[in-house]
């Protein structure tokens, strides 16, 4: 997860607003994409079409979603809240 102290380089690389992709990996549950979209809509409302890919064994799914980020604070908040979803194991 990004923190206030570790995001200096990320801040330097990004010019807001910008396109930003989140990849959320979690248990292969049908509600995973809906839970991810719910968090995204709270902080970056829009019309999204997440891409869902199953793992090789089918135990996990990855949900990729692209947003228009408006600030580093928004990026950090989304990383934090997406990671707090119960069935999520990792956010990239």
Swiss-Prot record:
GO terms for cellular component: cytosol. It holds the Pfam family DUF493. It comes from the Bacteria. PANTHER family: UPF0250 PROTEIN YBED. Belongs to the UPF0250 family. This is UPF0250 protein VP0718. It comes from Vibrio parahaemolyticus serotype O3:K6 (strain RIMD 2210633).
